[in-house]
């Protein structure tokens, strides 16, 4: 409840407004795109990335430095499961610009937490996010920023429709759906 929200905000020094990404920080997750999109967004919008770091972190750090947005990007790892929902719930939107991903389980979690989702086109992510999430080219930072702006304007409607859509994963075997998605690729 409210306690978890406050605890998460304090413990992880969460910014007032942030976009969220959850997953291992590795090349194919393409978090670089989220970093490159930040300069196109309002100054008070931050990016919070939750996940285990890999060597890809070096590349991200140099991009953050050259864009001069070090104070706007926050990497957090080792979050206990009981606080993760609080981090989802306080975000403005969920971004998932991954190039090759499985089914995008974090997308479903984000929608269930009441977040609008912006993901990359052309993988199984569209299957997870449904028709009311927004999808952008995996190399288009400005496009990602524009989609985030749009998601925030249409937030209530996007979230309501997407929540309806992801209900199908609650009562069906998600594994079956993932397999059927892969078979089409």
List each model region and its residues.
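A conserved mid-protein helix/loop that constitutes part of the nucleotide-sugar donor-binding site
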Residues: 24-40, 58-61
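Nucleotide-activated donor-binding/catalytic signature segment of Leloir-type glycosyltransferases, i.e.
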Residues: 60-82
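Short alpha-helical donor nucleotide-sugar binding micro-motif in glycosyltransferases
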Residues: 86-91, 96
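Aromatic "clamp/platform" in nucleotide-sugar-dependent glycosyltransferases that forms part
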Residues: 99
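Conserved acidic donor-binding segment of nucleotide-sugar-dependent glycosyltransferases
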Residues: 134-141, 150-155
């Amino acid at each position: 409840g409210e306690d978890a929200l406050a605890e998460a905000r304090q413990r992880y020094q969460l910014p007032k407004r942030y976009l969220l990404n959850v997953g291992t920080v590795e090349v194919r997750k393409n978090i670089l795109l989220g970093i490159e999109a930040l300069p196109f967004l309002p100054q008070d919008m931050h990016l919070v990335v939750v996940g285990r770091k890999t060597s890809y972190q070096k590349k991200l750090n140099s991009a953050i430095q050259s864009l001069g947005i070090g104070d706007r990007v926050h990497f957090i790892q080792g979050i206990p499961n009981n606080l993760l929902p609080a981090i989802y719930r306080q975000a403005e939107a969920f971004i998932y610009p991954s190039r090759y991903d499985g089914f995008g389980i974090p997308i479903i979690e984000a929608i269930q937490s009441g977040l609008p989702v912006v993901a990359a086109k052309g993988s199984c992510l569209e299957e997870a996010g449904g028709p009311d999430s927004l999808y952008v080219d995996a190399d288009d930072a400005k496009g990602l920023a524009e989609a985030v702006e749009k998601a925030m304007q249409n937030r209530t409607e996007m979230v309501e429709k997407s929540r309806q859509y992801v209900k199908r994963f609650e009562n069906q075997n998600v594994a079956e759906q993932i397999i059927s998605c892969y078979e089409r690729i």
